[in-house]
């Protein structure tokens, strides 16, 4: 049975970058664990803000967070109130100085993580899984995705036996290194149990000279 390699890990250092960027010897394990807890806390705090990616950089005891979100206004707040509150909460919880940068996602319909979370939200609202998948796929294609694949796994439609179903439109070349593949995963907590949602979005090929730049 063939298994899928993670699209980010497969392309790290080629056309994808690490989401935690720092070097350490003695504190490596504690930093990895702290990064996990920071992401968990920020995701929980900003769950309604369409947060796709949390990048972490460390230098001289300071932590820099780069948040990619579809709704930057909610993250920043009026006159920067919300972002200052988040910075203060993080400083109090983790005893470190934080700086936060917010990047807007112009097209959330072609961001795999946001698409996966959108499908999971629909499943929790009891929308039929096939309808949710097809509607999302057609929307992503309309907004410029060259290809998209969506997979749902679990007790679909309340079935006794768990299974997985997937739907694809366009090209999704997972083994082509120069392909710009975005990947996202989300979980739908339904009355029948958890349904896992995976999304792969192909945004086009990145040529060698673009990678070098």
Curated annotation (Swiss-Prot):
Span of domain KH type-2: 38-106
Cited Gene3D superfamilies: 3.30.300.20, Ribosomal protein S3, C-terminal domain
Biological process (GO), any one: translation
Keywords from the UniProt entry: Ribonucleoprotein, Ribosomal protein, RNA-binding, rRNA-binding
Gene Ontology MF terms: mRNA binding; rRNA binding; structural constituent of ribosome
PROSITE patterns xrefs: KH_TYPE_2, RIBOSOMAL_S3
GO cellular component: cytosolic small ribosomal subunit
Pfam families recorded: KH_2 (PF07650), Ribosomal_S3_C (PF00189)
InterPro entries: KH_dom, KH_dom-like_a/b, KH_dom_type_2, KH_sf_prok-type, Ribosomal_S3_C_sf, Ribosomal_uS3_bac-typ, Ribosomal_uS3_C, Ribosomal_uS3_CS
Physiological role: Binds the lower part of the 30S subunit head. Binds mRNA in the 70S ribosome, positioning it for translation.
Annotated family: Belongs to the universal ribosomal protein uS3 family.
Oligomeric form and interacting partners: Part of the 30S ribosomal subunit. Forms a tight complex with proteins S10 and S14.
Protein name from the UniProt record: Small ribosomal subunit protein uS3
Organism: Oleidesulfovibrio alaskensis (strain ATCC BAA-1058 / DSM 17464 / G20)
């Amino acid at each position: 049975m063939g298994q899928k390699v993670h699209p980010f890990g497969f392309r790290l250092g080629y056309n994808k970058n690490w989401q935690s960027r720092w070097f350490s010897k003695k504190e490596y394990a504690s930093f990895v664990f702290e990064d996990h807890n920071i992401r968990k806390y920020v995701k929980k705090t900003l769950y309604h803000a369409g947060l796709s990616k949390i990048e972490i950089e460390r230098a001289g005891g300071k932590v820099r967070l780069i948040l990619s979100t579809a709704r930057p206004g909610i993250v920043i707040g009026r006159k920067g109130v919300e972002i200052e509150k988040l910075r203060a909460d993080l400083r109090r919880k983790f005893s470190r100085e934080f700086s936060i940068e917010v990047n807007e996602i112009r097209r959330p319909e072609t961001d795999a993580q946001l698409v996966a979370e959108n499908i999971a939200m629909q499943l929790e609202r009891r929308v039929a899984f096939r309808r949710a998948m097809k509607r999302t796929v057609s929307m992503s294609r309309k907004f410029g995705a060259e290809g998209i694949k969506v997979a749902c796994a679990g007790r679909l439609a309340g079935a006794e036996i768990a299974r997985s179903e997937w739907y694809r439109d366009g090209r999704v070349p997972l083994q082509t290194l120069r392909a710009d593949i975005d990947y996202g995963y989300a979980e739908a907590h339904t009355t029948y149990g958890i349904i896992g949602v995976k999304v792969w979005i192909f945004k086009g090929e990145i040529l060698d000279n673009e990678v070098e730049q």
